[in-house]
Swiss-Prot record:
SUPFAM superfamilies registered for this protein in UniProt: Ribosomal protein S19
BP-aspect Gene Ontology terms: ribosomal small subunit assembly; translation
Stored InterPro entries: Ribosomal_uS19 (IPR002222), Ribosomal_uS19_bac-type (IPR005732), Ribosomal_uS19_CS (IPR020934), Ribosomal_uS19_SF (IPR023575)
Function: Protein S19 forms a complex with S13 that binds strongly to the 16S ribosomal RNA.
Official protein name in the record: Small ribosomal subunit protein uS19
Cysteine pairings via disulfide bonds: none
Superkingdom of this protein's organism: Bacteria
Keywords: Ribonucleoprotein, Ribosomal protein, RNA-binding, rRNA-binding
Length: 92
């Protein structure tokens, strides 16, 4: 179920402050963050965030198409190694 419109998008407060500091400074550094649940806002476009996936910070460069999505969508938490091959077929 989608979030109610009257509530507005959720963004952690510290994230807004960090993004504002980087914009004011004019430098393009990676903003480390642990808030995968935060929504990407239009003012984040052009910035690079290091989204934590439980192991390391995955760099995510925010573009126009990402606005409205959550940061966690762009940093996968699980590694897919594929399904196991049939052992009988391997031996032949």
């Amino acid at each position: 179920m989608a979030r109610s419109v009257w509530k507005g998008p959720f963004v952690d407060g510290y994230l807004l402050k960090k993004a504002e500091k980087v914009r004011e400074g004019g430098r393009n550094e990676v903003i480390k963050m642990w808030s995968r649940r935060s929504t990407i806002l239009p003012q984040f476009v052009g910035l690079t965030f290091g989204v934590y996936n439980g192991n390391k910070h995955v760099p995510v460069s925010v573009s126009e198409e990402m606005v409205g999505h959550k940061f966690g969508e762009f940093a996968p938490t699980r590694t897919y190694y594929g399904h196991g091959a049939d052992k009988k077929a391997k031996r032949k």
